[in-house]
Amino acid sequence: MKLPIYLDYSATTPVDPRVAEKMMQCLTLDGNFGNPASRSHRFGWHAEEAVDIARNQIAELVGADPREIVFTSGATESDNLAIKGAANFYQKKGKHIITSKTEHKAVLDTCRQLEREGFDVTYLAPKSNGIIDLKELEAAMRDDTILVSIMHVNNEIGVVQDIATIGEMCRARGIIYHVDATQSVGKLPIDLSQLKVDLMSFTGHKIYGPKGIGALYVRRKPRIRIEAQMHGGGHERGMRSGTLPVHQIVGMGEAYRIAKEEMETEMARLRTLRNRLWDGVKDMEEVYLNGDLEQGVPNILNVSFNYVEGESLIMALKDLAVSSGSACTSASLEPSYVLRALGMTDELAHSSIRFSLGRFTTEEEIDYTIKLVRNSIGRLRDLSPLWEMFKQGVDINSIEWSHH
């Protein structure tokens, strides 16, 4: 077993060796290096064929028509293209958008930008387990609502939203529904031929493909229109210009092909490992599970260890690559906005750790993790005056700290 142990698969994944192998065949002179838009020679045709195969592989995993898959530089761009693209195209119908407070920053900050441009955005607060209350969503819908953006799986706590029902609600009212499926694709079954979802964002690097490549699903029946955000040669049916990076696309396609084949067995294995990890730490005092094991994706476990400062905990766990909050916001010392939106205190949000497991996680690593966490928590609490006061029965919240 090598240290440190990687338990941050929700931030990114290593590229699967089978994916890397395929990608390397699309780079050098003796490989498939052509520009797929070059229609006048064999190099272009071969490149275009490779892109078509990958587009099919992605469409097959999610039950879409390959013509509905638009390649982008990643899920952040897909979220931007979907939300800005739909808002700009349909703004004559209305300027109201609904999303939730626990969305990824790529959705929240895009909505903030649209607010600056005169759109009206409603941010729903989820229930304490992270699930959106569908009655609240329904109550928020208005005649001028044009777009709802609610993710499939939350990147910090792993809870799964009921996108099928939300889709039905939106379709019944003629509202466009966008789903950020970054954390769910390849982990949960997605069938866009059944779901009433109009726009869906994907990425390569959360599912053992390369970074820098993603896709946006844009429904054809009923036809959804979006305004391009990137202009140029009119690639990708005019929705996203730019030369297609064949090696990245082939990598993403292969990753999605593997996911389709291995998803069921892999998720069963990860569920067992995640439950083993939770069973190993849940009997400690003042340990709380964030999210919902029943309504959660099998590879994420988010736990708060009360009376332990999150940053010191991460330092104590330096043999584990884990995060508090998401990678995108973990650089700031603010407590996770997702956990705060669940109604959690700053202290508890600050003491939370996200363990995310993946394809190369072993049982041995999980057992080592349990041992390390138990030892570290015990040691850090021994050093904590707050823990001592708690053990003596002092209500910490009733203390009035003097300001210096």
UniProtKB/Swiss-Prot annotation:
Compartments in which it is found: Cytoplasm
Q: What class of enzyme is it?
A: transferase
**Keyword S-adenosyl-L-methionine attached:** no
GO MF annotation, one: cysteine desulfurase activity
Report one GO cellular component.
L-cysteine desulfurase complex
Recorded catalytic activity of this chain's protein = (sulfur carrier)-H + L-cysteine = (sulfur carrier)-SH + L-alanine
EC id: 2.8.1.7
Q: Where does pyridoxal 5'-phosphate bind?
A: 75-76, 155, 183, 203-205, 243
Q: Which PROSITE patterns match?
A: AA_TRANSFER_CLASS_5 (PS00595)
Q: Which cofactor does it need?
A: pyridoxal 5'-phosphate
An annotated GO BP: [2Fe-2S] cluster assembly
Pathway(s) this gene product operates in, as recorded in its UniProt entry? Cofactor biosynthesis; iron-sulfur cluster biosynthesis
Listed PANTHER family = CYSTEINE DESULFURASE (PTHR11601:SF34), CYSTEINE DESULFURYLASE FAMILY MEMBER (PTHR11601)
Share what the entry says about its subunit structure, partners included.
Homodimer. Forms a heterotetramer with IscU, interacts with other sulfur acceptors.
Alphabetical list of HAMAP family matching this protein = Cys_desulf_IscS
Function, as annotated: Master enzyme that delivers sulfur to a number of partners involved in Fe-S cluster assembly, tRNA modification or cofactor biosynthesis. Catalyzes the removal of elemental sulfur atoms from cysteine to produce alanine. Functions as a sulfur delivery protein for Fe-S cluster synthesis onto IscU, an Fe-S scaffold assembly protein, as well as other S acceptor proteins.
By its UniProt entry, which NCBIfam families does this protein fall under?
Answer: IscS (TIGR02006), PRK02948.1 (NF002806), PRK14012.1 (NF010611)
The UniProt family comment states:
Belongs to the class-V pyridoxal-phosphate-dependent aminotransferase family. NifS/IscS subfamily.
Q: What is this protein called?
A: Cysteine desulfurase IscS
